Amino acid sequence: MVIFRTMGDVKLYLTHGGIWVENKYYGGNTNMVFVDKTLTVYELLVKVHEIVVCDLDRFVYELVSVFDTDGRVIRLNIKTDRDLHYVLVEANVNPPEIYVSVQEV
């Protein structure tokens, strides 16, 4: 986890342990991390696992970010590096928030 912030870092909220009700995530815990704008999904999953420890033989992480565009709420599943780049750089949300769900395999 990055402790000291650098010029290329983005503040990111990781929220986990809550529940989805339609397009809203309720409850849980939020951790703030600083990540590089070029962070990959794999690197993000490593950071998530440092915070949300679970048995990866039985569970997988689902990463989602929520955006309000012209009154329409969009849940973006973050599966690729391109998805993550959109959340961190292009979406103009400051700070971005990623919701972490743990799904049984």
Each language-model region and where it sits:
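Phospho-regulated scaffold assembly regions enriched in serine/threonine/proline and acidic residues
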Residues: 1-105
